[in-house]
Amino acid sequence: MILTVTLNPAIDVSYPLDELKCDTVNRVVDVTKTPGGKGLNVCRVLNDFGETVKATGCIGGESGDFIINHLPDSILSRFYKISGDTRTCIAILHEGNQTEILEKGPLLSVEEIDGFTHHFKYLLNDVDVVTLSGSLPAGMPDDYYQKLIGIANLNGKKTVLDCSGNALEAVLKGDSKPTVIKPNLEELSQLLGKEMTKDFEALKEVLQDELFEGIEWIIVSLGADGVFAKHNDTFYNVDIPKIEIVSAVGSGDSTVAGIASGLANDEDDRALLTKANVLGMLNAQEKTTGHVNMANYDKLYQSIKVKEV
């Protein structure tokens, strides 16, 4: 079983408009509301793929109830209730653009943070892999992912971390290392303080930096150009075919789902990398974020090339 952790989930609201007019009324006909957050995208894709998955995180208020009530019944909801209201994130789609209005989310108390920590320990009993995705809510220290990874490691669980900024830096500089991290080139550049390109030799060199010591897998997203990956001392380039993209939103989360599935099923390097990229591409072919159409899986799987470099 796979456990997905979304500490700062949201309700994602989409407002499509022909034109966004400022300082006046804009009327929306077609409103879409879905449970949002990187980890929730991961769990939905895992569910589509047929994996047994349970989802946790911190939720509160009517917005939190909405999230629980609008996840598929086959996903085991094991969320931790907090006093604050789960945030709402609004995307206004207009004239080919997307304007986002993102709430910060609730402020967690020390007691709530401690409560979730104990809740997390309990949830580890019957899982093999844990995914940790997205931003930390207000009140949680930057090293909180480091704490959860340490607990998972003590219990023999594999972890996949997909975050950025201070939270990622705290993990890399801490003692407890995740099994997998999945930065993109922009995030890698921020970590290293220099601009990174798709040059394989340069990527090889930086992924051997002491900053990444102790991390079994480093999987760097190159967008439409696939993936560059390091597993222990072996490097891979994953070449993906060109596809018609409907929406790339959530494709990174779908890739995390594939990584977690590969780890849970003890797949070899090539199978894990291929599955992860296929699920990311399948999500990009869908309008709905965090959804994959498995009818196209086999065809895409055969078109991906994994090369040791």
From Swiss-Prot:
Q: Which UniProt keywords apply?
A: ATP-binding, Kinase, Lactose metabolism, Nucleotide-binding, Transferase
Give me the Gene Ontology terms describing cellular component.
cytosol
Biological processes, Gene Ontology terms: D-tagatose 6-phosphate catabolic process; lactose catabolic process via tagatose-6-phosphate
Pathway in which the depicted protein is active: Carbohydrate metabolism; D-tagatose 6-phosphate degradation; D-glyceraldehyde 3-phosphate and glycerone phosphate from D-tagatose 6-phosphate: step 1/2
The UniProt entry, under InterPro entries, shows: LacC (IPR005926), PfkB_dom (IPR011611), Ribokinase-like (IPR029056), Tagatose/fructose_Pkinase (IPR017583)
Q: What is its EC number?
A: 2.7.1.144
Cite a single GO MF annotation: phosphofructokinase activity
Q: HAMAP family, from UniProt?
A: LacC
* Entry similarity comment: Belongs to the carbohydrate kinase PfkB family. LacC subfamily.
Q: Please give the name of this protein.
A: Tagatose-6-phosphate kinase
